[in-house]
């Protein structure tokens, strides 16, 4: 059998990585110290005043209120990037109810901690709205941190898919890096009109051989339903990165929306968060 030797890191990449480590040493040390301090405080909702805690679970069911009064079971904070503008995010509308049910099944609770904006380059390209695209990442990061700042949560589940949204969610969640965090995506759009066929219609339109109605029909047939883009763009590469980083349940990136397996993966992400919380207790 032919044995492959150890993999060699590209020297340029190794040099850049070393430089980043050196430049960030002080700030990383401060960050880790801050996270360790936050971790040492234990369940933060247990140290909230009665008035604070009552506000935090006022809208919950009586059963959840009783659970949240204690600090023996995990409470998952859901950060949701749902809207109807992004095909990849539209399926997230139903996720909070699914997550709450999954948490209940293992004796825990879940609350929607907050929502974050999400914009699609596919909608805004060629318009002034595109100028906000990259800036939106910082808004998303801030909104994520604000959502978790209620100090009611033992873990966080981030619901988001596309570029700017996933990095923003991750950056914001790292402000609470002592908490377990997982991501749950919506999955890819099913295949529609092929790129070759779509390109042919675009060419015909450019030549004046077909009208706008035919062009729109072709574009709609190619990009036709819920889920991530039907091409290997940054929405899909973000999902691969989340899975490689261990922030997804394995296999979660490319299961289409609306399937039983898709729901099972979302439930599994919730249950996994509950299990890795130090507070996890099995239901009796």
Where are these regions (language model features)?
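Ligand/cofactor-recognition surfaces for anionic moieties
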Residues: 2
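Helix-enriched interaction subdomains in cytosolic or periplasmic regions
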Residues: 5-52
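A short, flexible low-complexity segment enriched in Lys/Arg and Gly/Pro that occurs
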Residues: 19-23, 54-62, 208, 212-213, ...
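N-terminal glycine-rich phosphate/pyrophosphate-binding loops that anchor nucleotide-derived ligands
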Residues: 33-72, 85, 95-99, 105, ...
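Gly-rich Lys/Arg/Thr-decorated short loops/hinges at beta-loop-alpha junctions or inter-strand turns
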Residues: 35-37, 42, 76-83, 118-130, ...
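Long, structured ligand/cofactor-binding scaffold of large enzymes
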Residues: 58-179
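Active-site cavity-forming subdomains of large catalytic enzyme subunits
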Residues: 130-279
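Conserved small/polar residues in nucleotide/adenosyl-binding loops
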Residues: 280-284
């Amino acid at each position: 059998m032919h044995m492959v030797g150890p993999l060699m890191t590209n020297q340029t990449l190794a040099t850049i990585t070393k430089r980043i480590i050196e430049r960030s040493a002080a700030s990383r040390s401060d960050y880790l110290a801050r996270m360790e301090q936050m971790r040492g405080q234990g369940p933060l909702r247990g140290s909230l005043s009665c008035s604070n805690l009552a506000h935090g679970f006022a809208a919950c069911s009586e059963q959840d209120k009783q659970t949240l009064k204690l600090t023996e079971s995990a409470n998952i904070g859901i950060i949701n990037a749902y809207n109807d503008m992004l095909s990849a995010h539209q399926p997230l509308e139903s996720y909070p109810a699914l997550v709450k049910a999954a948490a209940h099944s293992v004796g825990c609770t879940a609350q929607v901690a907050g929502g974050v904006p999400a914009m699609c380059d596919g909608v805004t390209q060629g318009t002034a709205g595109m100028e906000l695209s990259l800036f939106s990442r910082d808004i998303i990061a801030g909104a994520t941190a604000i959502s978790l700042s209620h100090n009611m949560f033992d873990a966080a589940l981030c619901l988001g898919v596309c570029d700017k949204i996933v990095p923003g969610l991750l950056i914001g969640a790292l402000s609470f890096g002592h908490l377990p965090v997982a991501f749950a995506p919506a999955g890819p759009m099913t295949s529609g009109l092929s790129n070759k066929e779509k390109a042919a219609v675009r060419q015909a339109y450019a030549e004046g051989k077909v009208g706008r109605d035919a062009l729109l029909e072709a574009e709609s047939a190619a990009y036709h339903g819920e889920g991530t883009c039907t091409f290997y763009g940054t929405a899909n590469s973000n999902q691969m990165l989340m899975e490689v980083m261990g922030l997804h349940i394995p296999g979660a990136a490319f299961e289409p929306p609306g399937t039983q397996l898709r729901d099972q993966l979302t439930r599994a992400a919730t249950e996994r968060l509950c299990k890795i919380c130090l507070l996890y207790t099995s239901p009796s």
